[in-house]
Amino acid sequence: MSHHLFLPVVIMVVSPIPPGAFQDSVVSPTQGEFEDLDCGDCGRPEPSSRIVGGSDAHPGTWPWQVSLHQGGGHICGGSLIAPSWVLSAAHCFVTNGTLEPADELSVLLGVHSQDGPLEGAHMRSVATILIPDNYSTVELGADLALLRLASPAKLGPSVRGADLALLRLASPAKLGPSVRPVCLPRASHLFAHGTACWATGWGDVQEAVPLPLPWVLQEVELRLLGEAACQCLYSRPGPFNLTFQLLPGMLCAGYPAGRRDTCQGDSGGPLVCEDGGRWFLAGITSFGFGCGRRNRPGVFTAVAPYESWIREHVMGSEPGPVFPSQLQKPQSGPWEPREENCTFAQPECGKAPRPGTWPWEAQVTVPGSTPCYGALVSDRWVLAPASCFLDSPHDFETWRVLLPSRPEEERVARLVAHENASRDFASDLALLQLRTRVNLTAAPSAVCLPHHEHYFLPGSHCRLARWGRGELAPGSSAQLEAQLLNGWWCHCLYGRQGETVPRPGDPPHLLCPAYQEEEEAGLCWVDSSWSLLCREEGTWFLAGYRTLSDGCLRPRAFSPMQTHGPWIRHVTQGAYLEDQLTWDWGPEGEETEKQTCPTHTEHGACGLRPKSTPAGVLWPWLTEVHVTGDRVCTGILVAPGWVLAATHCILRLGSTTVPYIEVYLGRAGVSSLPQGHQVSRSVVSIRLPRHLGLRPPLALLELNSRVEPSPSALPICLHPGGIPSGASCWVLGWKNPQDRVPVVAAVSILTPRLCHCLYPGILTPGTFCVLYSEGQEDRCEVTSAPPLLCQTEEGPWVLVGMAVRGNRELFAAIGPEATWISQTVGEAHFLHLGGSSYWSPEGSDLCPQDLAGSASSPKVTALLLLLLLAPLIPR
């Protein structure tokens, strides 16, 4: 039973009672005392008190509640409706369309605690299981791991209608104070909207949090919702962006605000409502989207519509179930809203009128240590890094917590560190319980936490907030603003090479911000630690956290909070875990496909570009090199502070002055790139390799400051070898040097022999040539010296060469200059693609007469000869 939130991943299995302890007999020595109890006196438990709000039931309060066992453990609940009959949910006994054998099930009656039987408790075998012929399905077309059913193994791609089952016992139950039948409503019985009813069971107390020992029967008060009100709530997207259409015979109970509900393991149990001094079985626990989630009430099978079906199948049983007449028809109260005028409950957490001033910020002070910052996650619990406290004496009398707008400091009752806190950076978390509950208002208030299936959408507005020990932000407030990177960029840029990128709905390994403002020069963030807050529909979630950075740059990757929801929920039993609020996936829908991250080099990721990205949108290493005199050249970012360009475009022949050069990244012509920001840098030096008697074809431009790696400014990988093998290659450039929108042209690299034959006497060492695919020769203009890029399947992009002056087919290779680049740059990303040498044998005698020097002959003739004489390097 739950008054919080739940995800159905654990089936409650309890088997403390030894096998054979009952053997269809009564435990109590006074077993015959109540054999003549009047079965017509249904729905009248022994007088007792009960605790409101989802808690332990008093023994004997709900004497019709039974526990269904299979394989020695509890699987579902049920209700005794006659000495030989139990009513439960059909889905408890159907797996893949097949009904479970009745002889594998048993019914435990008169039990209050699963840890030990009461007097009068006894077990009965099941003789027969009956389900309606119209036990049907409603296809949702989505992953239904969220649905609360009896067992995850029994989940299917649908929600069941007519979800009820009759179980005939092998021998009648022994009636007594703890074993009595419940009344059944007639088909004409009406339960008023807003009626306070009660659900009972031994299910999970929260999502994925089983009922703890001694497994005492739980009860929770729920209010009935009318069909219009319930459908209104379920018509709004919720977990996994699912909506749901109620079927006839379904009944809803709960609250728009959630936090009280049934949970997994309660399936088949009773929802009873009092009417005229009797308790009627109004519904059977069927399913739900999580447990106790906001605007997601529990769904029950209404019993009244099945009066005829029940009577038909129990006919001849004496005594049978009782269907008392309803003394007075109720009228729905004002609580029932109209569907077109439905009001949704809003989150009770994550409200910050002034971002940057966080009403949940908690400052924990321990004698002898600097303050540690965390976040208030409920009215009694603070979440903070465990590393703040692992070496501190646990003398909680001296610990204090300062909360916003609280004149006095709070005292600490206990500390619960994550079990992996000392071994795993991603589990560096601890929960501090306050001695007294805090009245949550505008300040202090709690931050929202994400469920494990929460998918923070790419582009979500996020912000850094203080976390753990460390200094304040060294820069302006704008330095803390960020948008969230999509999963592919995050995991492939900052995660492990070759890892599979989690799909939306699966817990991510990392969360990564893309900062909106560039790093301020001279600042270092090494002494500060941060959490990542992300906003959805005006509500802030604690999305991730990171302790002290390992460098001066702002933190790039955060440990996600999604994976820790079950632990936080289990410890606090009151933290504000909130459903996803934003579902506008926009252009990032391609992330639903399985993707793997390319190889990294020793300096990290390079040459990353999503497969599905349009050619003119994102080439994060492509730079515009603006040279004095309105000349614009193509450049390639090869390290955070270096750009590679063609010498002939940067330096004019005969010029003795060094031009002023500006470099721009993060834009495609006049448009800025998504997932990042435009970057500009000035060039402070131009480096050329030493070439005896020849002007070197490549130049390195040193930038005045480093460029932060991002999807809009990322170094490319460099190929240090010869002609790459098994790679597809393209020339990347601009169709029009005025608008500078990137275009690519597919090419094949020719063998050294063919290249030598086509250009005899004019090839310099380290030069190679390409053949354009049909119709692509004129896609890129050549004055800006475009680069040649290659990529192997699933691999990163690699720079192979830069165009030679005035020629679209000839390129200066990167390989011969690899040593010079490595010595000059230091952080260049080299990735060898294999392949053959660039050098070819000298002498025209090795070239066919018709081919030698035929580079300017008609292309058709040249292409035919090339195809006949030598293979092309495959694209």
UniProtKB/Swiss-Prot annotation:
It is an enzyme of class 3 (hydrolase). Glycans are attached at N96, N134, N241, N341, N420, N439. This is Polyserase-2. GO terms for cellular component: cytoplasm; extracellular region. Residues 24-50 form a propeptide. Transmembrane segments: none annotated. Residues 1-23 form the signal peptide. Its main location: secreted. One of its GO terms (molecular function) is serine-type endopeptidase activity. Serine protease. Hydrolyzes the peptides N-t-Boc-Gln-Ala-Arg-AMC and N-t-Boc-Gln-Gly-Arg-AMC and, to a lesser extent, N-t-Boc-Ala-Phe-Lys-AMC and N-t-Boc-Val-Leu-Lys-AMC. Has a preference for substrates with an Arg instead of a Lys residue in position P1. The 3 protease domains are not proteolytically cleaved. Its EC number is 3.4.21.-. Keywords: Disulfide bond, Extracellular matrix, Glycoprotein, Hydrolase, Protease, Repeat, Secreted, Serine protease, Signal, Zymogen.
